[in-house]
Amino acid sequence: MKKIILLLLILAGFITKNYSQFKITGTISDSKTHQTLPNASIFIPELNIGVISDLNGNYTLENIPNGKYDVKFSYIGYFDLIKNLSEKNNILQLNISLNPKSPICLNQVVITAGTYSTQDETAIKIETINKKDIEGFGGISLIKDLSRIPGIDAVSKGNGIATPIIRGLSTSNILVLNNGVKMQNFQFSVNHPYLIDEFGVERIEVVKGPASLLFGSNAVGGALNMIKESPAPKSTIKTDVNMNYNSNTQGLVTNVGVKSTPGNYFFGLRAGIKSHKDYIDGNGKIVPNSRFNAKSFKIFTGFNAKNLVSKLFVDYNLMKLGLSVPPAFKLFSGNDRTNNYWYQDLSNILISTKNVLYLGKIRNELNINYQTNNRKLFETPDISEEFKTVDMLLNTWTYELKTSKPFGDHKMIFAFQGLNQNNKNSNAPEHVLPDFSIYDLAGMGLVQLNFMKKLHTQIGIRYDFRHINIKKQEHVHQDINKNFQNLSFSMGLTGILSHKVLIRSNIASGFRTPSIAELSQEGGHGARYELGNPNLAPQRNIEGDLSLHIHNTKTVLEFSGFYNYINKYIYLSPTDETSIHGLPVFKYLQDNAKLYGFETNFGFFPASWMNFSFAYNYLVAKKNNDSYLPLIPQNKLRGNISFSKSFDKKQLKDFSFEIESIYAFVKNNHHIAESNTPAYNIYNLSAVQTLAFNRQKIKISAKINNLFNTTYIDHISTLKGLGYYEIGRNINIGIKIILDKH
């Protein structure tokens, strides 16, 4: 591997001297008034390069390798415009007219489909959650906030612990990615949160349905991809300071980011802290030990040469996370920030490199990632190292070599991927998972065909091989050596029937190998005793999706239906047995399963400053015998009314106000070990005002979640049955200061 990397770098040095480039130049203006727009952004996501227009709206973007790219033009208060660029000349004159915003926006550049594409070019339905929406949630947990999106929910244990659910599937059945890198956090359990926060995230891309073609094992239900923020435009320094206070938990959040692009080199760094006391539910009761404290530090850097783009990212996250479990309730002595007992001490370091080399029209990408995740559990009030109960260290190397080549309006993509992973327990008394190692190898081919810009098809196939090695050790009575193989496919079609109507269909397969816990676990975990099964077979599924998008100047309608059939679905089932310590025994079993349903969205925009939207999702999840699967969320109806106004004042700028309603229907069709869950209805409010002072902007926000302090419990909350409910009224006050220096 080292020799290959060295050879590529030497080759890159030679090639960057011999391949030509071009530049684009032009003027950005308003499409109606024809006034020029200063400080507009011009950005090429694939190359990670960008500039801003000058006081007269003029711009020049240089050092662009010959090839095909999507260029994004954006300006506050206007629609983003995406231009497909394919040029071999030295200079391209490109004048752009931007349209003032209305609430309807169809197209964005996405990367989770395997390559940079606009949304209407992808045969896979990819939803995007932009930075404005992420900042506007106003919740305490990013993952829980995502449950406001139809088809996405979260299994939670308080505020700090939340695991996403996509169309009824969670934990080992979905993937969470940090800028395209699989997060590794012992995700077999809902008690193990992903160490990632909302700061430094440009947008979140959501794939609903099998994504094994792109990511391999575990992407049975879909994937969430947290896309990192873009570098600063050339010759600028951007700084943002974020401060938030949450009334319910007396939560304090501070995050500061700085980034700059002095030339062909760019860099950025970001640091933040979060501290929350135990939360108070709608009944006014303190939920013991739901507190958490977190720290984060992020760095990115890179450079653009003639035909080479190289980027390095380092993320370091720390979290001390209280566990709201019955043994902790007995030790509760008062609300506090400090983690004293029954808490997880978590750390995660992710180092990733992304390197792109252009050889004519051929794009070659080499990505290498290293991730280390340490999970410690302390149960007693003594926080010294001698009293830790669990101490596991998971080290993961992943690598990817990808090549894409356009031919006409079409594109071919080939990729080779691999993973080396090992887990090591220290001398802590409990080994939740044994020591193990995993090795993956995979090859993938994908063809994207575009006909007359009206019909887009995507066909792909992938082969995966996985080897799992678990040596005989405590709670593992024999060596477990397993080899798994799988062939995945995906076929999709997007038809643009008119500029107002888009239809998309897709059929895809997915798979996942049994997790280490499912193969080997034997011991207490939480409030139960879990028994693994070394003879479990891989899960395989196939899903069909059909979606429709219709819009005009005042309305938008979207519908997405799906049917997901899973062969040998793995689940944890209760038994009639009891362990020697009195814990109920649960065993991992397999059965065929089916999940089907739909999501629909309707928006009405009577004026440019007013927006009404409604969304409903429906889901059924059963085994073949028609009994229900566990941890399936309630069907929900969401309503939203928003008002926005842009002021052409010297200091007073954008203002927005939003009212949101979430209604969860009663849940009486559930797994045999679960109980009925009543319906609930909660309301949220938010208001944001932007002020401007020269090159400084200040955003002041006030958000109220659970406005009427409703007492409720969600069906998939792990606190259900313990006498505690979801968080009560929470008022979030935030200030964001943005400083630009040219």
For each feature predicted by the language model, list its residue ranges.
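Short, acidic, small-residue-rich periplasmic hinge/interaction motif at the N-terminus
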Residues: 29, 40-45, 74-78, 88-135, ...
